[in-house]
């Protein structure tokens, strides 16, 4: 399988499956001298850990304790590859015995079979959402690099199950259920998820990511535009079905004069561009949103086929999230950080040559 490495200069390669021995990754290209500890990575992993997130979360309990294997000495990176590993401890593969030969609707079962001629039916293997653990750990390394440059990334939920939130306090979202950007919406989202769970169904939502302190000049036109790379990063997450930057699809309904961000001596008067112009960061806050589909594992009867082409009725068992939100929020934050870290180092190379 190819496609397990992300980045050009700051590169993350990941490994592992949902029901394998463990997951992990290697970050190559991280400069020396960056403050980094296991605790810093663990803090990010704890935000996406299974068994939390209230009624939306899976019943699978994983401690997700990370071990740094290389690349760090006395609390700082050495410039060599940063390797990390997390053990799987709560696999329950017996839950999947009845779907050994059955394709689950909405999952990658049928496409993995078409591509490889075989698949790991236990929780989806590499296509499972558990794969994102390695992204979050790698993203923590990227965030450590960005922090040294005054760049921070935040992510929060702006809509769940069709119910929007008012982004009144995005900074406080990290301490609220569902990573909600306002307090009042939490009870409403909680009731919605419980209702959907009671019906044996699932819901999706929309997550917003913001990056602050991004300097002007990041991005490599034409095919490595910052917005193109960011969209690629977010779309690479399995549950994401759409990405918009800044005003996004709403810009299609505006006039040019309304969509343009006027410039003044004090800076930009708006941010419809989402902090990116011509594929290059403008110095404003970088803003992106990702549409997250409902989890395809629903506790209802569904029509499908098995690997011999026979029609069957399937009711998915096992332990599953009711929504990818809130656990996908740290994943999208991580992918944004990885993109910015890579672009930052690409820009440093260019300016070094120019100097």
From Swiss-Prot:
What name appears for this protein in its UniProt entry?
A: Chorismate synthase
User: What are the top taxonomic ranks of the organism?
Assistant: Bacteria, Pseudomonadati, Thermodesulfobacteriota, Desulfovibrionia, Desulfovibrionales
What is the purpose of this protein? This reaction introduces a second double bond into the aromatic ring system.
Q: What keywords tag this UniProt record?
A: Amino-acid biosynthesis, Aromatic amino acid biosynthesis, FAD, Flavoprotein, FMN, Lyase, NADP
The record ties this protein, via Pfam families, to:
Chorismate_synt
Q: Which PANTHER family match?
A: CHORISMATE SYNTHASE
- Provide a GO biological process annotation: chorismate biosynthetic process
Residues holding NADP(+): 48
> Which residues are involved in binding FMN?
126-128, 278, 293-297, 319
Q: Does the keyword Transferase apply?
A: no
In the UniProt record, the signal sequence range is none
State the GO CC annotations: cytosol
Magnesium keyword on record: no
Q: Which PROSITE patterns match?
A: CHORISMATE_SYNTHASE_1, CHORISMATE_SYNTHASE_2
Q: How does it assemble?
A: Homotetramer.
Q: Which cofactor does it need?
A: FMNH2
